[in-house]
C-alpha cells in the first residue's frame, strides 16, 4: 500500500457550451479522515457554495491539477478522436504527472477493460478505475469538486462576455433558448461544441425552428 492516494474525475462531459475539465486530486493517506468528512456527499448534490467551502478546506492538504479542453479544441479534435479518447488522454497526462500512489479514476467507459486499453494507449501509469467512482471514493469526489469549480468559473467568464445562457447543458431550458436565438448563438459560437452529438440531437428536435 502506498502512502499517497489520488483520484481523477471530470466536469462538463455532456455540456454543449464551454470546456471539458479533467482534474486530479492527490493527498497523503493520513488525511483520509478529513477527506471523508469533506467529501461524504455526492459532489453533484452539493450547492456551488458548498463546493467552494469544501474546496477551500481540501486545498489545505490536497494537491490539485487539471486540464481544460475548450470547445474550440474539442471541435478540432473530434474528427479524429471520440470523446472517450479525448478524456482518457487528459486523464493519462494527469496520471503521469503524479507521484507513485494508489490512483482511482472515475472512468467514462462502462467497461473497465475498454477504458484500460484506452489509457494504456496514452501511456498511463498504474491505476484502478470504476464507473461513478466519485460516489464511492472521497479522493475522486475531491477531484470532481475541483473540476466542477474550475468549469463553473470558466462558464461564468463566458457568461460575462455574452450574457446569460444557463448552465451550458442541453437539459437546461435557458441553454436551449440561448441556442435558438440567432444573435446569442453568434456570440456563443466560439464556445459551442459544434461537433457534439448533443447539439446534433437538439437540431434534430427542431431546436432551430424556421431555419434550413
Task: Please report, for each region that a protein language model flagged, where it lies by residue.
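RNase H-like, Mg2+-dependent phosphodiesterase core
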Residues: 1-212
Amino acid at each position: 500500500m502506498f502512502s499517497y492516494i489520488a483520484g481523477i474525475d471530470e466536469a462538463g462531459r455532456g455540456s454543449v457550451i464551454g470546456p471539458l475539465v479533467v482534474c486530479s486530486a492527490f493527498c497523503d493517506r493520513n488525511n483520509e479522515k478529513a477527506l471523508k468528512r469533506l467529501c461524504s456527499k455526492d459532489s453533484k448534490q452539493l450547492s456551488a457554495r458548498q463546493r467552494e467551502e469544501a474546496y477551500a478546506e481540501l486545498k489545505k492538504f490536497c494537491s490539485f491539477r487539471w486540464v481544460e479542453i475548450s470547445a474550440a479544441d474539442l471541435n478540432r479534435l473530434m474528427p479524429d478522436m471520440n470523446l472517450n479518447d479525448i478524456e482518457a488522454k487528459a486523464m493519462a497526462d494527469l496520471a503521469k504527472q503524479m507521484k507513485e500512489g494508489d490512483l482511482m479514476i472515475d472512468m467514462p467507459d462502462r467497461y473497465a477493460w475498454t477504458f484500460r486499453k484506452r489509457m494504456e494507449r496514452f501511456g498511463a501509469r498504474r491505476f484502478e478505475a470504476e464507473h461513478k467512482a466519485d460516489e464511492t471514493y472521497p479522493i475522486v469526489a475531491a477531484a470532481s469538486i475541483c473540476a466542477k469549480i474550475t468549469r463553473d468559473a470558466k462558464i461564468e467568464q463566458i457568461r460575462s462576455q455574452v450574457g446569460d445562457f444557463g448552465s451550458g447543458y442541453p437539459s437546461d431550458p435557458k441553454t436551449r433558448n440561448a441556442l435558438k436565438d440567432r444573435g446569442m448563438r453568434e456570440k456563443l459560437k466560439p464556445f459551442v461544441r459544434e461537433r457534439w452529438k448533443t447539439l446534433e440531437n437538439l437540431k434534430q428536435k427542431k431546436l432551430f425552428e424556421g431555419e434550413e
